[in-house]
A protein has these predicted regions:
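Beta-strand secondary-structure signal
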Residues: 9-11, 20, 49-51, 61-63, ...
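Contiguous, well-ordered beta-strand patches that form the walls/edges
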Residues: 39-76
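Tryptophan-anchored aromatic micro-motifs
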Residues: 1-19
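Feature targets compositionally biased, intrinsically disordered low-complexity regions
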Residues: 6, 14, 28, 35-37, ...
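Short, solvent-exposed coil/turn segments at beta-strand boundaries
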Residues: 3-6, 22-30, 55-58, 76-83
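N-terminal glycine/threonine-rich, aromatic-flanked beta-hairpin/loop signature
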Residues: 19-53, 89
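Beta-sheet ligand-binding and adhesion/scaffold domains
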Residues: 14-16, 61-103
Length: 103
């Protein structure tokens, strides 16, 4: 990996959905929902197994499945501070675009 993510935390701002995400290791992450926007309860926290792949320098494909069964797939462009997110909750797909800031 060109960019070292392990041990770093970021704020993902996806419209009304706001999450603080920490890369615990290359295969594990943890998050806290700051503002759930109806997709998750505010304050929900979870540790998840990651499938994290570097696409090119500073751009990662990151996906995981949450305990609820919700799935999340991100394209995280740290060079440009942009996150593209596909989230499924209760079988419904949400496509979101937002910003990444180091926490």
């Amino acid at each position: 990996m060109t960019r070292q993510l392990t041990g770093r935390s970021y704020r993902f701002h996806l419209g009304d959905l706001k999450v603080r995400f920490t890369f615990d290791s290359p295969t594990q992450g943890s998050f806290v929902v700051i503002q759930g926007a109806g997709l998750a309860p505010d304050g929900h926290a979870e540790t998840v197994a990651l499938d994290l792949r570097e696409i090119r320098a500073g751009v990662f494909l990151n996906s995981w499945t949450e305990a609820s069964g919700a799935t999340v797939t991100h394209v995280e462009d740290f060079e440009n501070g942009t996150v593209y997110s596909n989230v499924t909750v209760d079988g419904k797909l949400y496509n979101l675009v937002g910003t990444i800031e180091e926490a």
